[in-house]
Amino acid sequence: MSITKDQIIEAVAAMSVMDVVELITAMEEKFGVSAAAAVAVAGAGAAAEAAEEKTEFDVILKAAGANKVAVIKAVRGATGLGLKEAKDLVESAPAALKEGVSKDDAEALKKSLEEAGAEVEVK
């Protein structure tokens, strides 16, 4: 009983990106070839797939900027922290403000903080 090309394709399609990378490496070693071009194409596809799959984002305050008071107010409003905690968080930048939030919430938080003068990154 032999395996058909379609069965192999289905098996590879069901694998995770890391499993596919390991499979390619093993095939390169087994057959003594280099799949550098194929890896680059697969890597680009994997990066796009990973970006689509990401549903939780972290909002990082990189710097408070010139208007620290406005940034502290924005942080308090977004996080529910007290004045002292928000001030400490802003002064300890770079610091994580919120972790595991949706893309829409992360972008809204980033926008409000940037309007207050902060430098913000969404990861």
Swiss-Prot record:
CDD domains, A to Z: Ribosomal_L7_L12
Keywords tagged on the record: Ribonucleoprotein, Ribosomal protein
GO biological process, one term: translation
Pfam families in the cross-refs: Ribosomal_L12, Ribosomal_L12_N
A Gene Ontology cellular-component term: cytosolic large ribosomal subunit
Gene Ontology molecular function: mRNA binding; structural constituent of ribosome
The keyword Secreted belongs to this UniProt entry's keyword annotation: no
NCBIfam families documented for this protein: L12
Self-association and partners: Homodimer. Part of the ribosomal stalk of the 50S ribosomal subunit. Forms a multimeric L10(L12)X complex, where L10 forms an elongated spine to which 2 to 4 L12 dimers bind in a sequential fashion. Binds GTP-bound translation factors.
Family membership noted in the UniProt record: Belongs to the bacterial ribosomal protein bL12 family.
Function: Forms part of the ribosomal stalk which helps the ribosome interact with GTP-bound translation factors. Is thus essential for accurate translation.
Name by which UniProt lists this protein: Large ribosomal subunit protein bL12
Organism of origin: Salmonella arizonae (strain ATCC BAA-731 / CDC346-86 / RSK2980)
Gene that encodes it: rplL
